[in-house]
Structures are given as structure tokens and as C-alpha cells.
Amino acid sequence: MKKRSETLGSDQSSSEIIEHVLEELNLKNIERRVKKYDQIESEYKTNIENEKKAFIKDVSQVQQKIKEFEIQKANQIKQLNEEKLSIEARKQQLEIEIRNQLLQYAEKLRIVVKTPMNQPTNTEV
């Protein structure tokens, strides 16, 4: 306190000195508050940046999973289409075989109907 009174001058009253000391204390208090505010703001910004990075990473992982899912589904669709074509080809093949067998049976039936009952047919063994 003595130093302050020396710096302020010996002609100042104690109330002026007290006022000056209070102003300095107030300034120090303000400086501490500003420093604390800056610290909180810095932590907040750091947390925001960390959350942003984590969010971007999560979004990237989700996008990757979506791409993998799309590729998987495209492969499944391709496989199903190939199976469908194979089944359709087999169906057509069976239709042709059935039609040929029916024609053979129809021809045999026609021969049986035209042949008298007591004559052997070339289909009998």
C-alpha cells in the first residue's frame, strides 16, 4: 500500500487511494473473468471440433456401409436375374420336351386308333 501511495503521490487522500486500489482489483477481476471466458470458449470450440470430426467420421462410415449394401444388393439382383434366366431357359426346354412327348403319344394313339384290334402295331414289342 505504501508503494501505491508513493506512485499516486503523497498529496492524494486515502479515499482516492482506496478508489484507485478498487479499480485495479476490479480490472484484475475483469481480466480473470475474460481469461476464464477465453478458456471456456476455447474448450467449447475444441469440443465442437472434436464432435464435428466424430460426426464426419460417423457419416463417412454410414456412407461406406450404404455403398457396401448397394453393392451387395446389386450382386443379389444380378444373381437372381441369372437364376431367373436359367429357370426360364429350363422351362422352355421342358416345354419343348413335353410337346415332343405329347406329339409322340398322339402319334402312337393315332396309330393305335387306325390299326384294327387284331393286328399288331409296330409300337408293340
From Swiss-Prot:
Changing residue 36 to E: Decreases meiotic gene conversion at ade6, crossing-over between ade6 and arg1, and double-strand break (DSB) formation at a DSB hotspot. It is found in: Cytoplasm; Nucleus; Chromosome. Transmembrane segments: none annotated. Residues 45-104 form a coiled coil. GO terms for cellular component: chromatin; cytosol; linear element; nucleus. Component of linear elements (LinEs), which are similar to synaptonemal complexes, at least composed of rec27, rec25, rec10 and mug20. During meiotic DNA recombination, binds to and activates DNA double-strand break (DSB) hotspot sites. This is Linear element protein rec27. It comes from Schizosaccharomyces pombe (strain 972 / ATCC 24843) (Fission yeast).
